[in-house]
Swiss-Prot record:
Gene3D superfamilies: Winged helix-like DNA-binding domain superfamily/Winged helix DNA-binding domain (1.10.10.10). The lineage of its organism: Archaea, Methanobacteriati, Methanobacteriota, Methanomada group, Methanobacteria. InterPro entries: HTH_HxlR, WH-like_DNA-bd_sf, WH_DNA-bd_sf. Signal peptide: none annotated. This is Uncharacterized HTH-type transcriptional regulator MTH_1285. Keywords: DNA-binding, Transcription, Transcription regulation.
Amino acid sequence: MYILTISIPGYSGYSGDDMGDDEYLCSVEVAVNEIGGKWKSLVLCTLKDGKLRFSEINRRIPKITQRMLTRTLRELESSGLINREVYPEVPPRVEYCLTEKGKSVIPILDALCEWGKMYGSHQENSGEKAP
């Protein structure tokens, strides 16, 4: 096995003596940094069918707190995966939708979902490996 170090402008990876702030061990690390975590993938999947307001996203992911949803939306917007659109109305209306970059992640998340269905619950419940 070998380790490939890649530099990606605009991304901050490990900091330390051995690696610069924009280096990752591999491109998988970049992807996990962008879409990893407990909530990012769920928010992205929730937005795959179109624009939603904060309250609608919160309703569709009932276990996420408002504070964590706010933080997750900000991180996804900062990464360029979602767009936040503020409408000049009273009361204010804000909608979130996937960017092209965000849409490009959906097939990957769909594949992870299928993998989870195939191996996750089957192994937990029966102790057997799925086909």
